[in-house]
Amino acid sequence: MKRIVSALLALAAGAALQAAEVSVAVAANFAGPMREIAQAFERDTGHKAVVALGSTGKLYAQIKQGAPFDVLLSADAQTPARLEAEGLGVAGSRWTYATGHLVLWSPHPGLVDAQGAVLRSGQFNRLAMADPKLAPYGAAALQTLQHLALLKTLEGKLVQGDSIAQAYQFVATGNAELGFLALSQLLVDGRLRAGSVWQVPAHMHAPLRQDVLLLVKGRQQPAALALMAYLRSEPARSIIIRHGYAL
């Protein structure tokens, strides 16, 4: 019995020594699913994911300035490709972990119709979106307004947040009646939040393909390598789909 107990203690000590932290930069639109993935990742591997949220543009700037991130979960494909080309990401490590959906949402029932005609009516004071220079979902919102030939008409009503999370706050707090957001921000236990919504047709903007990249700092970090693998696992994929993303 003593030998068995000693063996179990040795195994536990070994597991504790192997467990590590991975520092993850995560695009703001992916905050909800990443919280769940981080919990499942720690439960299944023993490793802990320390998450920093922000707009993709700001995360890129932080990485360029030497921020100690091991992994980047971007809201686009271009930023990871740029970091890889600049030698800040591990060559060949990036891949698409999710494809997002842009929506127009208001907490007011009936304000947003199924075709987004409210944009042409102009019967609102403020329209929120993320800064297109910093956030891919903001760029998609801008492209949508350009596609509809409404940018010039509505530019005086636009309010921009640094990230898609701030754009959501503008709408949720009543500082804007409606806003362009990520579908994932509106799902609670698989159901849409109360209000009214238009899912923007995909042809109106560039695809919201979201890539993950192993950064140079994390290339020899067991926890970083484990997270890169875990994002492909069935538990992670199920969480991503449940939050409104395509794979």
Protein language model features and the residues they cover:
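Intrinsic disorder/low-complexity segments
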Residues: M1-R3, V71
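Exported/periplasmic ABC-transporter solute-binding proteins
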Residues: A20-L53, G57-A67, S74-A77, A81-V90, ...
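Bacterial N-terminal signal peptides
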Residues: R3-A16
